[in-house]
């Protein structure tokens, strides 16, 4: 409770000089904190021990997070606002309060909030400033494994994480942060809202990502810092952005940013994309604060890394250990599902992709990301994705889907790859397409590509 009390005291001390901007309104930190206490008492009045919410971004959602730490409840679960009732049914427990701004037929106890701003401003100020600091926060996995897993963290873990990130992310005291990704997303929560509150930054929040709106805010306001998923940067680059913008900091996480995207961002915005890396289970655990190679990330000093190397290889499965390991995971080392190598001197992790995407050809492990990085060095190839095709002899063969303004032969591409990669990693086939498919979360849809190549 001491950590939380200090955190809340800091928010109060930032007082009326720092703001959260939303649509045409602004709220100072004192208002945000006061509403958080009022909201905590409001939640307690319902009598439920568990609270779920899939609200879109607003100052109300920021206060709801803080209120969950203050209130006498046991569990707070923020949920992706894009999920539909069928998916929500697998997440939301019956004996709980579900706070939503969408019409839902879910058979649970619902608090429907039609207008977050009106609700926020209508809450009466409480004089009860008791802080209980007992609820666990559970961020939810994306469901790609077939079920939704809740990862539990104590308030002390979260507050310590926020304080530890103050100097790690490259944010500065006078930054103005634009939050365009759902705050219920672990990336936006851990890399944006938490450190911004800990530092005392001005924050502009938009309800949900809209490339035109983001561009307009960048052009009109004093926003200096932005963090998005790779696909969001693609959409943002299609907009008109003034060359005299005030941006100085661009972070990217959620998926590996391609060389072509990094180059395009640098050309248009004049800034490097700074890679971050993390998981829903442990939040972010690494972030570059200066330009680096595309697939390298500086790991936070409070995170230990272990690599279980593949045979005859300098890279392998990535395991991590830090203070953010979820309470409901009984393991000392967390397997990330990623593959890479780690430099203990520079404390940098080289990331080569997901383990499930590794191609095993004739017993040799081949990283798609490693090949994609090399392929994108060939002129006129704008984007690519490398995948495996089932083969009776080799087990798997190596194929690439290419988006290119000039079509090359397989032989030509393999000749180019010899400058970068060993012979056994050469491509067995290429297919030209108009665009690389993406998932609903904006990531490269490797599953669909694998199904396409294998006619599944």
Walk through the language-model features, giving the residues of each:
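Gly/Ser/Thr-rich phosphate-binding loop
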Residues: 225-227, 237-294
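Conserved AMP-binding/adenylate-forming core of the ANL superfamily
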Residues: 8, 13-45, 58, 86, ...
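AMP-binding/adenylate-forming catalytic core of the ANL superfamily
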Residues: 41, 339-425
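Conserved AMP-binding/adenylation subdomain of ANL enzymes
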Residues: 159-176, 184-225
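AMP-binding/adenylate-forming catalytic domain of the ANL superfamily
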Residues: 421-444
